[in-house]
């Protein structure tokens, strides 16, 4: 007689073994209809799972994150079934859940076309409407291999060979299609109501370029049609905001094949960069950081000491000269420790905060590169704080204040926070970890921040806090981080003299707010759709004349604005004013100033905002005050 304990603390007793679906029906018919799976003693299972002993059970529906993952996983199988029906010669390989959807890789004699995707999606809709039951079975390993070989699915047979011997081999069948899978799956295809195939791309089997190129079909799936429609609308908006397109359109930057993963910054884009960098530099000064500069290339001996040569070598660019091996730095921390080590420090010198806009390079795979968001050459607002264990809490608390001020000024008001704690394999004593984790948690609470705890997700050398921004489209971007490090200071011999005259290793805090400058500028461009706020805009105002008679007046207006520290340009071309207004409006400039005969005679300018608002004519001094206010208020 199993006793089932539910999340609300109540219990239900059954006369014999009972499935998750039967428990859901016992609770209520509505819950039974909504059930997608269950969690038995914390493990996700199908609704057909048979519970034989006392257990904790929660029913998974589409309101749960696990429910959405089950929907997406099951939709990947629906895709595979449709492909096999339409293209019987295709072989199925793997089909995992990814962010916002899923993909499935197929081996086929030719690439799938957009027309193929339309047919496949239509077949998926038909299969979903049929509400086909999805049935789980377990096979012996040899039997499963023989089965997949008999139906020509060699990839599935190969996958079984890589499954650990102590894991059972489970298969899921829906009508004429059977796939190898651990689960969990929806009880029937009728639960899959909102999905769309997005694109097809190439992908190597097992990610190895020596293997066959497969066809990867990407899709998205949601619990409700409204959710799918909202996601597709967000993608449309994101397409309009694509920083790669805006970078060229607004003359900010470009990238080219001769320098993969590197950025060519144009004058306008470099202005934005400089404004962000100078803002962060001012923050460094305000919060007591000292700016430094470390070499871009260092001898392999340094990287061997730090452990990068052994553990990160494939991601490093290396070179040789005069029989010595060198590496281009992928990160700044070893260099900062060298500066710390150059002087003998007392405990009175701590905390010591060293900051650098450090130029780093990482040999990212070419397929992973994506505009400014994933590059090979990047600059970080990197800083390292050398402190004692007792100083960690206050340093982290101050960093959080600094970070939130910066994000607010850049226009990000919603920040998600995660605290990652000790993994199984780690350096340092339990006492040190206890103290460090508590310091981070207290610093977060001190700043009244809610945070998600991620047990076991810290690095082997210390716990960390991650800060994730939500942009204007609701997308999440992990940017800020502060990471404790018990390991590297000891490994590279960083020491200070304590009160008792003994030598101790400092705690090292790795911290960044914007992270990669390139990536952060990409995020800013997309967040603002290229319409940068006045304080960041490369051109804050464009002054236009109506006829040649105002050319000198326009020049004097430009001179006065520049004297007040503004970034201003003029357009004196002999074109219709409507043409010039339209052209410069496409450049998303904060203000257009129009000078006609009347404005020239009265010392005024006619002001238009980039939103198309006509503010009318005003004295130049009034506009100067308006723009000063915009810049000061970071709008």
Swiss-Prot record:
The keyword RNA-binding applies. GO terms for cellular component: cytosol. The gene is thrS. It catalyses: tRNA(Thr) + L-threonine + ATP = L-threonyl-tRNA(Thr) + AMP + diphosphate + H(+). This is Threonine--tRNA ligase. It is found in: Cytoplasm. It is an enzyme of class 6 (ligase). Catalyzes the attachment of threonine to tRNA(Thr) in a two-step reaction: L-threonine is first activated by ATP to form Thr-AMP and then transferred to the acceptor end of tRNA(Thr). Also edits incorrectly charged L-seryl-tRNA(Thr). PROSITE patterns: AA_TRNA_LIGASE_II (PS50862), TGS (PS51880). Its main location: cytoplasm. Homodimer. Zn(2+) binds at residues 333, 384, 510.
